Structures are given as structure tokens and as C-alpha cells.
């Protein structure tokens, strides 16, 4: 009998993680899909090992929206590490280079901004013109997609510039990723030798300094927890966040959540993402 019991335990240990995971986060996601009348994609990944802890529609495509700006600045930092770029280099631009929602770059038409300042604006304030100016330095959308392929991401693709890339048409593969691919790419940028240790810390700090993510996971974060994140939004039923989370002010897990094809208001989308985040945190603390 003891031998049989040991065999059963060994067999259970080989089953996919989803079998063991508490259903609570997944139940919250299913509830969110019902309330949103749309689709939710999510993955929770251990930062150190890359192990998937929880997943839902993790291999389905979702619009990246402004979450692509983290990958963009990762590509910029890779060029810095290679000696092809400098964060201190000043970029000058004109009024016609500005697009909708450029709260930082619109104030610096006269003096321009450095590459580092543009990355900070793109991530912390989601400045769209800053993102376009940076995109030009890496070869545009095609150049950023090529960078993704070079680091082993064969799924994520950027096809357009701000602000067209936020169109989020149903069934459109342009400017999309999957939760699993985005999480794996973010992990590569922050833990592998794709970036120097200095560049990894800089990318993480820009995400820590995010100033436009308040209504999402930050709104349910317990005291003393770490968060670094980047959000994305579309007027056509999409919303997203990529984040690093952990208790004791340590980044331990990557969480990626995307919504698409929902008629819900932006406030409702924010609330649902916050609810999923709260469920993950509660499950984590058990």
C-alpha cells in the first residue's frame, strides 16, 4: 500500500502545474471574462526559474498597446550595451513629430530630450511621441520585431507606429503578442545576458517609476510589496499590463494580463485587471 501511495504521489508530481494550482485566480479570470463579455489572457511566471505558475489563454494573441514600450526600451538599452547608442545623446524633434498623448515630449520642443529621458517618458508616462522617436533609433517597427526575433521571441510583432498600433481590431495579428511570449521576453531582458546588469536595473527602475498605472494592480498591492509595471490601453475594447511583483519589496514573479474585444468602459477594464491582480496576490499569500 505504501508503495502504491508513493507511486501516486510521484505521478501527481509530473502532472501540469494547473492541476495543483488553486482555482481561485482562474475562477476570477473566468468571472472577469463573463462580466467583460470579452477575452482575458494572463500568465504568472516565476522570475528566477521561468516556471509558469498560472495561465489562461497564455498562447492567444492580444494587442500589445503601450506595453510594447518596455520591449522598445530594452532594445534601446541593448544598443547602448553594444556601443551603438548613448542614453545621454540628445534628440531634437519638431512639432510635426508629435502625436496624440505626449505629455512630456510636447514640453521639450525647444531643447529636445536625451535617449534616456525619452525612455523614461515612454515608460513612466506612456508618452507616444517619445516612443516613436525611440522606435526610429532601432529601425522602426520592423527593427523592433527583428530585435525580438534575435532574442528568441518568434511571436511578438510590432507593425505600426504610435498611435495606430493601438487600433486593436478583432482578429488582427498586427502589433500583438501572447501573454506567454511577453512574459518570457521580459524575463530574458531582466535576467539573462541580453542586457548588462546596469541596463537591467535601468529598465526595471523605469517600470518602478510608472506613474500611469495607479488604477490597476497598484491599487490592490499590499504594503511592503514590490511592483514595477507598464500598462497599455485602446479605445477599441483592449487593456493590458506587464508587471513584476513580490512581497518584501522583491521582484519574484512576472504577471502579464491582457484584455480584448470587450465593450466595457476603461474604468471597468481597470477594475477587472485589479480584481485579477488581487486574486493572484491572495493566492500567493496562502
Curated annotation (Swiss-Prot):
GO terms for molecular function: beta-lactamase activity. Coiled coil: none annotated. It is an enzyme of class 3 (hydrolase). Its EC number is 3.5.2.6. The keyword Glycosyltransferase does not apply. Substrate binds at residues 230-232. GO terms for biological process: beta-lactam antibiotic catabolic process; response to antibiotic. It catalyses: a beta-lactam + H2O = a substituted beta-amino acid. The active site is at 66 (acyl-ester intermediate), 164 (proton acceptor). Transmembrane segments: none annotated. Keywords: Antibiotic resistance, Disulfide bond, Hydrolase, Plasmid, Signal. InterPro entries: Beta-lactam/transpept-like, Beta-lactam_cat, Beta-lactam_class-A, Beta-lactam_class-A_AS. Residues 1-21 form the signal peptide. Disulfide bonds join 73-119. Belongs to the class-A beta-lactamase family. This enzyme hydrolyzes cefotaxime, ceftazidime and other broad spectrum cephalosporins. The class A beta-lactamase family has a specific amino-acid numbering system, sometimes called Ambler or ABL numbering and often misspelt as Amber. A multiple sequence alignment was used to derive a consensus sequence and then the consensus was numbered taking into account insertions and deletions. This allows use of identical numbers, e.g. for active site residues, despite differences in protein length. UniProt always uses natural numbering of residues, hence there appear to be differences in numbering between this entry and some papers. This is Beta-lactamase SHV-3. It comes from Klebsiella pneumoniae. The lineage of its organism: Bacteria, Pseudomonadati, Pseudomonadota, Gammaproteobacteria, Enterobacterales.
Amino acid at each position: 500500500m505504501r508503495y502504491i501511495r508513493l507511486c501516486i504521489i510521484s505521478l501527481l508530481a509530473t502532472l501540469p502545474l494547473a492541476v495543483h494550482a488553486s482555482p481561485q485566480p482562474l475562477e476570477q479570470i473566468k468571472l472577469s471574462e463573463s462580466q467583460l463579455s470579452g477575452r482575458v489572457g494572463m500568465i504568472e511566471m516565476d522570475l528566477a526559474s521561468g516556471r509558469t505558475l498560472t495561465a489562461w489563454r497564455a498562447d492567444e494573441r492580444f494587442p500589445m498597446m503601450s506595453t510594447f514600450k518596455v520591449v522598445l526600451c530594452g532594445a534601446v538599452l541593448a544598443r547602448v550595451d553594444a556601443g551603438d547608442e548613448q542614453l545621454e545623446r540628445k534628440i531634437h524633434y519638431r512639432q510635426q513629430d508629435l502625436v496624440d498623448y505626449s505629455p512630456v515630449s510636447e514640453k521639450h520642443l525647444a531643447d529636445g530630450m536625451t535617449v534616456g529621458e525619452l525612455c523614461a517618458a515612454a515608460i513612466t508616462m506612456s508618452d507616444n511621441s517619445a516612443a516613436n522617436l525611440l522606435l526610429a533609433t532601432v529601425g522602426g517597427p520592423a527593427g523592433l520585431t527583428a530585435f525580438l526575433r534575435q532574442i528568441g521571441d518568434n511571436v511578438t510583432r510590432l507593425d505600426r507606429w504610435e498611435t495606430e498600433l493601438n487600433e486593436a481590431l478583432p482578429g488582427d495579428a498586427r502589433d500583438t503578442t501572447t501573454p506567454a511570449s511577453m512574459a518570457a521576453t521580459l524575463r530574458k531582458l531582466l535576467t539573462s545576458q541580453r542586457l548588462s546588469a546596469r541596463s537591467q536595473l535601468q529598465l526595471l527602475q523605469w517600470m518602478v517609476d510608472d506613474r500611469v498605472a495607479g488604477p490597476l494592480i497598484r491599487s490592490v498591492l499590499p504594503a511592503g510589496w514590490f511592483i514595477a509595471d507598464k500598462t497599455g490601453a485602446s479605445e477599441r475594447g483592449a487593456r493590458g499590463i506587464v508587471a513584476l511583483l513580490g512581497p518584501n519589496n522583491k521582484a519574484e514573479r512576472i504577471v502579464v494580463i491582457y484584455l480584448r474585444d470587450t465593450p466595457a468602459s476603461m474604468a471597468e477594464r481597470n477594475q477587472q485587471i485589479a480584481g485579477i491582480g488581487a486574486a493572484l496576490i491572495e493566492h500567493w499569500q496562502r
